[in-house]
Amino acid sequence: MNLVLMGLPGAGKGTQAAKIVEEYQIPHISTGDMFRAAIKGGTPLGKEAKSFMDKGELVPDEVTIGIVRERLSQDDTEKGFLLDGFPRTVAQAEALESLLKDLGKQIDHVVNIDVDAEILVPRLTGRWICPTCGATYHVIFNPPKVEGICDVDGSALMQREDDKEETVRRRLDVNIEQSKPLIDFYAEKGYLRTLDGDRPIDVVYADVKALLGDTE
């Protein structure tokens, strides 16, 4: 079973991915993990990717696709895989189809965990940290006993720049703009299944299982 998992930051994609790979016994393959493994392994493509990353530049598609090809050629993908964070563009999706064809494989399902951006903003802006001890809180999921104060040492909590509302909204806008052509691409191919992610985790996963079917 070969899957692509899509969803905005905070939509619960990681949670669903963990449940899928545990039940279906397929590897969870993220772009970051692939890059780190290639770099750690000192592969030619890994070295090439590192040279771009060290300069703060985007890794070109041809390098990324090469690393994806290497990863999907490994033995643990024989029964399937779950791709997370790749592809990000239609060009990458087309390249993925081509390389899978070369490997005698194809995408079975593209699962899009859909949650409205306005629901995601509070989830993504709710994290506050203690600058003294590093304790992490979330105003919805793990609030401190006293608002704005660390339970451990009484320090005033702070919010990282990445977690501020303006930054979060900008990041979501970019993700929505980038993902729309990809969603349209997979919808036209007939692979796309969009699930409502604004429900309890187990309810969403029940829909995922209904889509994917029983384990073999």
Curated annotation (Swiss-Prot):
Cellular location(s): Cytoplasm
Matches recorded under Pfam families: ADK (PF00406), ADK_lid (PF05191)
Biological-process GO terms, alphabetical: AMP salvage
Binding positions (AMP): 31, 36, 57-59, 85-88, 92, 160, 171
Residue sites binding ATP per the record: 10-15, 127, 136-137, 199
EC class of the enzyme, as a word: transferase
Keyword Zinc listed: yes
Pathway: Purine metabolism; AMP biosynthesis via salvage pathway; AMP from ADP: step 1/1
Region (LID): 126-163
InterPro entries the UniProt entry points to: Adenyl_kin_sub (IPR006259), Adenylat/UMP-CMP_kin (IPR000850), Adenylat_kinase_CS (IPR033690), Adenylate_kinase_lid-dom (IPR007862), P-loop_NTPase (IPR027417)
Keywords per UniProt: ATP-binding, Cytoplasm, Kinase, Metal-binding, Nucleotide biosynthesis, Nucleotide-binding, Transferase, Zinc
Main location: cytoplasm
Protein residues bound to Zn(2+): 130, 133, 150, 153
Reaction(s) catalysed (UniProt annotation): AMP + ATP = 2 ADP
Molecular function in Gene Ontology: adenylate kinase activity; ATP binding; zinc ion binding
A GO cellular component entry from the record: cytoplasm
Assembly information from the UniProt record: Monomer.
Role played: Catalyzes the reversible transfer of the terminal phosphate group between ATP and AMP. Plays an important role in cellular energy homeostasis and in adenine nucleotide metabolism.
Family the entry assigns: Belongs to the adenylate kinase family.
Domain notes: Consists of three domains, a large central CORE domain and two small peripheral domains, NMPbind and LID, which undergo movements during catalysis. The LID domain closes over the site of phosphoryl transfer upon ATP binding. Assembling and dissambling the active center during each catalytic cycle provides an effective means to prevent ATP hydrolysis. Some bacteria have evolved a zinc-coordinating structure that stabilizes the LID domain.
Protein name in UniProt: Adenylate kinase
Species of provenance: Exiguobacterium sp. (strain ATCC BAA-1283 / AT1b)
